[in-house]
Amino acid sequence: MPPWAAALALLLAALALLLLRPWKRAVGARTSVRDHEEQEVASGGPADQFSDRREALPGGCSLICKPSALAQCLLRALRRSAALEPSPRSWLSGPHLQTFCHFILPVGPGPELAREYLQLADDGLVALDWVIGPCARGRRVTNPGSLPPVLLVIPNAWGRLTRNVLGLCLLALERGYYPVIFHRRGHHGCPLVSPRLQPFGDPSDLKEAVTYIRFRHPAAPLFAVSEGSGSALLLSYLGECGSSSYVTGAACISPVLRCREWFEAGLPWPYERGFLLHQKISLSRYASALEDTVDTGKLFRSGSLREFEETLFCHTKSCPISWDTYWDLNDPLRDVDEAAVPVLCICSADDPVCGPPEHTLPAELFHSNPYFFLLLSHHGGHCGFLRPEPLPAWSHEVILESFRALTEFFRMEERMKGLSRRRTSFLGGRRRWGGLQKREVSPSSNLEEIFNWKRSYTR
């Protein structure tokens, strides 16, 4: 797909948005700006249901989480963060401008990438883009004396590589990380070699990719960041793997958490049309390959994101399933209680794609699960959180600072466990050994039987 085609689609949606007044809120919420501001004043924050266990942060942001030692560590790091300090309001403050700048503006030259194609167990292909440059002169070291951590970045579910994703990779590279971008089957130049695409919340391909990354960097900490609708994939992976996950910490930028309701209610018209057109353009090159699997005529006539998703994954010719069954298998929160990795979700109260937090964010998840943390801001749009150039998006700064805090917290925990083990050994008790990693890395011979990979260099 030509890179200008998706940008043109979203640009047309942006123009339509400027002409369309009023538009409906996502997930069925219709509230005026005035009512929303009155609610904020009355509740002291963006959403009334999040008033419990709310910790104030700079810039009018809040951290909602279950009290714990880890929460206190993260809270201290966020309160020291310069990225959250309030800045003068600019023309970028509006939620739609934040969102459109993120999705529409050209990505620019971007980083230098080394692409690997990973052949999966069913012979499908996914792509891993390793960020190899440019290396800044003043590159910081995140963990002195240890291997550089790997940062796995998962773009949105539509497959569009945005300027913010590339900006995060460049900032992470500058801070001493080794970033790698995961691309699904058929996304961003990854060939679709089998007539099977990845469902919205199916983490099977991501599992194999993470195992391969672990094979390549067995001793390096692994962190993961997802953008927008791509968060469903990351959360599904963390839930299915539980304590066996190789990931040390994760973050989700503007995640879609109530996915089924999000599809069924629909987005504001310009966003719905823009994302739908982008998907149709992306899959049009594979129309002939998909003819034996789905009704491509109906697929490309779809008038909504729900109809497109349902036609592509539910109304298949070989094994059709119901819409209810599809979400039983793909709801990203279906196994959320099994997740054993700290997850920071950064959301905005003015998100025009997800909708207001009181309708789209499950407050009980952050109140009851000690691994989930919600950073809620008043402004930022959808995956925007932009600041005046040349400053990076403040969400990127916050994510990397939170990962640093997690690393220090876990290092201290391991140190305390080590002291306890030595004391037990000195007293003659039974010695117990604990490892930094939850699972042993599979022998290379076994992995080589599963995976085949190719590498090509791109700029």
UniProtKB/Swiss-Prot annotation:
Signal peptide segment: 1-28
Cellular location(s): Secreted
Gene3D superfamilies registered for this protein in UniProt: alpha/beta hydrolase (3.40.50.1820)
Keywords: Phosphoprotein, Secreted, Signal
Active-site residues, Swiss-Prot/TrEMBL: D351, H382
GO process annotations (BP): adipose tissue development; lipid catabolic process
Function field: May regulate adipocyte lipolysis and liver lipid accumulation.
The protein, known as: Protein ABHD15
Annotated source species: Mus musculus
Lineage: Eukaryota, Metazoa, Chordata, Craniata, Vertebrata
